[in-house]
């Protein structure tokens, strides 16, 4: 008991000293931060729509916290909801609002997936953080629509944009889709290879072709990587020191898929992938007279085939640039095992000689006259001529020749497109597009005139390529007419953000020789090719 009294006596001075120190400390209430106005789930189309959020932040002591309040910072962090990381080795490695603003409005350049987003409010006076989570579901824009292949910036970085068809009533441009889908850094885009097939293997084939590498894209997601390089996927022996720059499929009538695929490399070698058997692949160069021998001549980066549907062609047209002559490929026989090219023999009463002695400027496959291929050739005097060779059936039928064209600027033009319903050639000159009537030798100048700061970079008619057009999921008259609209790609030379590209769609009135714009989309880089990703 004595010891207990002593303890109490010793404790009383301590209590007294605490009361004496009252007021020597800064006592304050800790603010409670609440976050309101964020959705539980935000749904966007990847590469096309923006992630938009404008939360309300409240302090129990200060009221509404605005984004200009110097005592607080705001951060949006994003990660895969299912696990793993967006950025390898960096958990929560993606910041949406790099400008630090409370409200976010930024493009969603992410692959299709469900993501977890964390909005963090930090009181920099105390270091205390308050966070709220919400989901972001990114859907794919790649299901159907116009794939727009572009070259971006001074380095011509390859990028794939798209005009996504989400429904009959809704289309939406999407940009730089492959940035998050594994495409290696490549430059100088050339074209998109598109070979639809109903066979389970390989199914629809989509190739991105560039001068620095060509890659197969996943037919649903567009994902790719170095292992999907065309040399690794479709060549028996990957060619060294050469890159495919042209790719096309030949359909000979099957309702399931093509007869053969062809590619031409930057070294002037041609290859054939004869389809119909498992494991079909590109073999040795076919620009030779005997299978497996070394190439005997170089070919131009064009292949002419019939684009009629149902398919009706058994042959393909090439141009020998060394000997300045047309050469041909045909379906296999004992003498021609699908892996050689043969010089074409002039027919009796020929319109022209297949050995032209001229430079091939351009060649295009069409549906006109049930499979006509047009070739633009230039003679030693710089004058240009147009030859028409029908590739339906066994092909190589000389059908038309056009000389002494009354077409101002044609001999200097580098962008061309031939119509498949009317005998019309379209060619570009600066910011203008002219229409030449092959039948009447008449030019309708400046049927399209773009702003003076724009330059035409691309002309094309996108013919649907399903083995049977009746397989297409949209059989409307309007949709079918789209393939006969002229696509005009242009670039604003004053653009400073690498997004000065515009794609316009123009209806052609072949009766009245008129052209009218239906619609256009902008925000692309410099357009190199456009192909419609069809659906059955």
Task: List each language-model region with its residue ranges.
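Acidic/polar, low-complexity intrinsically disordered N-terminal segments immediately downstream
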Residues: 19-176, 477-483, 491, 495-536
């Amino acid at each position: 008991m004595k010891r207990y009294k002593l303890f109490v006596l010793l404790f009383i001075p301590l209590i007294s000293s605490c009361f004496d120190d009252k007021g020597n400390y800064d006592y304050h209430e800790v603010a409670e931060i609440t976050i309101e106005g964020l959705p539980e789930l935000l749904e966007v189309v990847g590469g096309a729509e923006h992630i938009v959020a404008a939360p309300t932040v409240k302090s129990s002591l200060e009221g509404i916290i605005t984004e200009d309040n110097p005592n607080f910072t705001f951060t949006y962090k994003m990660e895969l909801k299912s696990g793993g990381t967006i950025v390898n080795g960096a958990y929560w490695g993606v910041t949406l609002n790099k400008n630090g603003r409370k409200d976010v409005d930024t493009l969603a350049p992410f692959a299709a997936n469900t993501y977890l987003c964390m909005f963090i409010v930090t009181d920099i006076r105390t270091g205390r953080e308050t966070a709220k989570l919400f989901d972001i579901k990114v859907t794919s824009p790649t299901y159907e629509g116009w794939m727009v292949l572009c070259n971006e910036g001074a380095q011509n970085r390859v990028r794939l944009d798209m005009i996504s068809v989400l429904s009959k009533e809704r289309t939406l441009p999407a940009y730089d889709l492959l940035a998050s889908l594994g495409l290696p850094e490549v430059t100088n885009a050339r074209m998109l290879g598109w070979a639809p097939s109903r066979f389970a293997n390989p199914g629809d084939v989509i190739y991105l072709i560039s001068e620095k590498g060509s890659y197969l894209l996943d037919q649903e997601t567009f994902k790719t990587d170095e292992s999907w390089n065309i040399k690794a996927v479709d060549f028996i022996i990957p060619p060294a020191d050469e890159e495919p720059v042209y790719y096309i499929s030949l359909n000979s009538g099957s309702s399931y898929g093509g007869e053969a695929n062809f590619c031409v490399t930057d070294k002037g070698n041609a290859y054939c992938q004869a389809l119909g058997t498992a494991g079909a692949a590109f073999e040795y160069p076919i620009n030779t007279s005997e299978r497996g021998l070394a190439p005997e001549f170089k070919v131009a980066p064009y292949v002419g085939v019939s684009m009629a549907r149902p398919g009706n062609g058994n042959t393909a047209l090439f141009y020998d640039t060394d000997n300045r002559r047309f050469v041909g490929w045909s379906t296999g026989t004992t003498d021609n095992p699908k892996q050689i090219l043969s010089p074409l023999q002039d027919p009796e009463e020929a319109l022209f000689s297949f050995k032209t002695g001229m430079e091939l400027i351009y060649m295009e496959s069409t549906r006109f006259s049930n499979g006509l291929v047009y070739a633009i050739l230039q003679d030693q005097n710089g004058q240009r001529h147009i030859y028409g060779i029908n590739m339906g059936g066994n092909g190589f039928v000389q059908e038309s020749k056009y000389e002494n064209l009354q077409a101002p600027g044609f001999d200097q033009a580098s962008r061309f497109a031939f119509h498949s319903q009317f005998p019309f050639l379209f060619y570009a000159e600066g910011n203008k597009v002219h229409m030449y009537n092959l039948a009447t030798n008449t030019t309708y100048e400046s049927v399209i005139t773009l702003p003076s700061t724009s330059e035409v970079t691309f002309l094309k008619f996108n013919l649907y390529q399903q083995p049977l057009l009746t397989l297409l999921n949209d059989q409307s008259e309007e949709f079918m007419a789209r393939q006969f609209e002229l696509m005009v790609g242009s670039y604003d030379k004053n653009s400073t953000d690498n997004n000065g590209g515009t794609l316009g769609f123009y209806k052609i009135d072949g009766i009245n020789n008129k052209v009218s714009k239906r619609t256009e989309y902008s925000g692309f880089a410099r357009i190199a090719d456009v192909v419609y990703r069809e659906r059955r």
